[in-house]
């Protein structure tokens, strides 16, 4: 059984779409989502401290989330059920500040995203019961939890239907504020 993880492309600087091993046989499917040694081999140093599962109805928008120092964290995310549009906003100082990219993740592909510190993260669920799994490199700290208002930066969420957004996410500051 191969344990190959491959960087498929750089989405934003140091933010990677990574393919992971997927094995299918008569019993079903087996996925290897994380292997510290394999990640080190492709140049990604990541030691996770916590893991979360987010289950969402269709048209739910969550984000744009990040944590402030000293609890900032890198993340590995993947979609284990349904499908999502994953949105990444660079909030690091420098030439890439304000860059935004998105990618569709779904349960049938074998991709995950490595998100470094300094990237605000959010997503829109494209199906009922979409499930996103997060591994983070630091423990969640409510006092350091921050966010950017989902519609305050240059990204088209394609909201033909009214999105479902928590009051917490609706009260985040605007990107330019």
Predicted features by range, described:
Residues 1-108, 129, 136-177:
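Non-catalytic, conserved peripheral segments adjacent to functional cores
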Residues 105-128:
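Conserved metal-binding segment of the jelly-roll/cupin
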């Amino acid at each position: 059984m191969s344990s190959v993880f491959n960087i498929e492309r750089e989405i934003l600087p140091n933010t990677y779409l990574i393919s992971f091993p997927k094995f299918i046989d008569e019993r079903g499917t087996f996925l290897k989502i994380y292997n510290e040694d394999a990640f080190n081999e492709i140049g990604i140093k990541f030691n996770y401290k916590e893991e979360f599962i987010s289950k969402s109805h269709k048209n739910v928008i969550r984000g744009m989330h990040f944590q402030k120092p000293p609890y900032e964290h890198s993340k590995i995310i993947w979609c284990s059920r349904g499908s999502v549009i994953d949105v990444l906003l660079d909030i690091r100082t420098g030439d890439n500040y304000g860059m935004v990219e998105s990618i569709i993740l779904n349960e049938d592909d074998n991709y995950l995203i490595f998100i470094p510190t300094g990237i605000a993260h959010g997503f829109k669920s494209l199906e009922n019961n979409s499930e996103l799994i997060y591994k983070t490199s630091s423990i969640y700290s409510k006092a350091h939890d921050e966010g950017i208002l989902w519609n305050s930066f240059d990204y088209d969420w394609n909201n033909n239907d009214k999105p479902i957004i928590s009051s917490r996410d609706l009260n985040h500051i605007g990107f330019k504020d």
